[in-house]
Amino acid sequence: MVSGEFASMKSLHGMVPHLTPMPIAWGTYDSDPNIHFFLCAFVDMTEDIPDPQALGKGLAELHMKGHSPNGKYGFSVPTLQGTIPQYTEWSDSWEEFFTNSIKKVFEAELKSQGSDPEILALEEAIITKVIPRLLRPLETGGRKIEPRLIHGDIWDGNVSTNIATNFPVIFDATCIYAHNECKSPFIKICAIDS
């Protein structure tokens, strides 16, 4: 699903071009339909993580500018965290979006590991008790969260420093419009177990 990475990087580049390589194209090899490519502008980078203050400032700028185009949570195309599909369907509330994302993690766990009564009980508790208690108050009583574009997979392997500018660079994105402090940790849970 290279199209998801291309759309993610295009969205990021539209908001913070100084923080991302410019995406150019994506496609599938004519000679082998199982091989795909993503092409972006070359950025000569260090092997070190960027200055935390500069990276934080760049991500804050992204979250300030990255308004959802339809006011909803989700993303316009499917994206992947490695080989794991990320939930991207449009949702009206953060609670709804996050709940559906967690359900997808549990579905993947069930498919991968089979049925387990403890996991099923944990899923029930998280879906019916934990998420509503933690997230519902963020969007009730006059409070509102505006969905913001997030990278979706920020870690030290997806950030670097541009040698020419000394500015941070972010890449390998799996974007969603989400709570601006979300880092898609629910996908990481599934990825660790796979």
Question: Where are the predicted features?
Answer:
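An alpha-helical support segment within catalytic cores of ATP-dependent transferases
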Residues: 28-32, 67-151, 162-165
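Active-site activation/catalytic loop segments of kinase-like enzymes and analogous catalytic loops
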Residues: 108, 175-194
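ATP-binding pocket architecture of kinase catalytic cores
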Residues: 1-96, 100
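Short, glycine/charged-enriched secondary-structure capping and boundary segments
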Residues: 53-55, 165-166, 183-186
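Hydrophobic HxD+1 residue recognition
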Residues: 154
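Hydrophobic residue at the +6 position relative to the catalytic HRD Asp in the kinase catalytic loop
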Residues: 157-159
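Activation segment
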Residues: 29, 45, 168, 174-176
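Hydrophobic "anchor" residues on beta-strands that sit immediately upstream
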Residues: 21, 37, 147-149, 168
